[in-house]
Amino acid sequence: MIHETAKIHPAAVVEEGAKIGANVTVGPFTYITSTVEIGEGTEVMSHVVIKGHTKIGKDNRIFPHAVIGEENQDKKYGGEDTTVVIGDRNVIREAVQVHRGTVQDKATTVIGDDNLLCVNAHIAHDVVVGNHTHIGNNAILGGHVTVDDHAGVMALSAIHPFCTVGAYAYVGGCSAVVQDVPAYVLAQGNHATPFGLNLVGLKRNGFEKPEIRALQKAYKEIYRSGKTLEEVKPILAEMAQEWPAVKRFSDILETTERGIIR
């Protein structure tokens, strides 16, 4: 069903059954399959491919040659009807690829709201991207990766499958991340190592000085005290009772499967 206010270029192909919302625009030579749903106000430019069981929210901008909802590159994939879900107000730049999920995980790839996915970024199967993130040019998020709210993965960086980049963390350009990056941490290199807190990001996002000082103390406990992680956990748990940001920083110690960058 195509809303009466949607504007579909005559050279675009929108299969019967696709749900195209109010005030959506679709540019020439774009291909949208019958199982796609696009929310109101979204702009789909020329030469875009949107396939499969893909649901896209409101007011997104999708630039030329982006491919969303294509079959994933997992060898176990057998053509199952897995999905892509994208929220609102995202900017998806030229040649970005977002692949559908696998039944071996949650069968969906998720992108939240207000994200910037730069040119040729690759979002693999079963990735979960939060809100307000920045994924740089040619960055690669491997299968099952999580990038939490307000995190940044800069140009030409690669995140190993099953890794997490925590909230407000920042992965510098040309980095290879093979373990989890805790929230708020600045990481760089191949393999990526921690270089302190993402202080610029914290200040830009309104963190107060006392909270930043608490995070700096927590960071030193993990990375500079010489203590084991088991020794650090009760110290951080006590700090977390007063500072929610410290809890977010330390939660990954309990959930990590690949370990954290050291």
Curated annotation (Swiss-Prot):
Any one Gene Ontology cellular component term annotated for this protein: cytoplasm
Keyword Cytoplasm part of the UniProt annotation: yes
Pfam (any one): Acetyltransf_11
Subcellular location: Cytoplasm
Catalytic activity: a (3R)-hydroxyacyl-[ACP] + UDP-N-acetyl-alpha-D-glucosamine = a UDP-3-O-[(3R)-3-hydroxyacyl]-N-acetyl-alpha-D-glucosamine + holo-[ACP]
The entry's keywords: Acyltransferase, Cytoplasm, Lipid A biosynthesis, Lipid biosynthesis, Lipid metabolism, Repeat, Transferase
Keyword Heme: no
GO molecular function, one term: acyl-[acyl-carrier-protein]-UDP-N-acetylglucosamine O-acyltransferase activity
Gene3D superfamilies linked to this entry: Hexapeptide repeat proteins, Udp N-acetylglucosamine O-acyltransferase, C-terminal domain
InterPro entries: Acetyltransf_C, Acetyltransf_C_sf, Hexapep, Lipid_A_LpxA, Trimer_LpxA-like_sf
HAMAP family: LpxA
Cited PANTHER family: ACYL-[ACYL-CARRIER-PROTEIN]--UDP-N-ACETYLGLUCOSAMINE O-ACYLTRANSFERASE, ACYL-[ACYL-CARRIER-PROTEIN]--UDP-N-ACETYLGLUCOSAMINE O-ACYLTRANSFERASE, MITOCHONDRIAL-RELATED
Subunit structure: Homotrimer.
Record-stated family: Belongs to the transferase hexapeptide repeat family. LpxA subfamily.
General function of this protein: Involved in the biosynthesis of lipid A, a phosphorylated glycolipid that anchors the lipopolysaccharide to the outer membrane of the cell.
Protein name listed in UniProt: Acyl-[acyl-carrier-protein]--UDP-N-acetylglucosamine O-acyltransferase
Organism: Vibrio campbellii (strain ATCC BAA-1116)
Name of the gene this protein is made from: lpxA
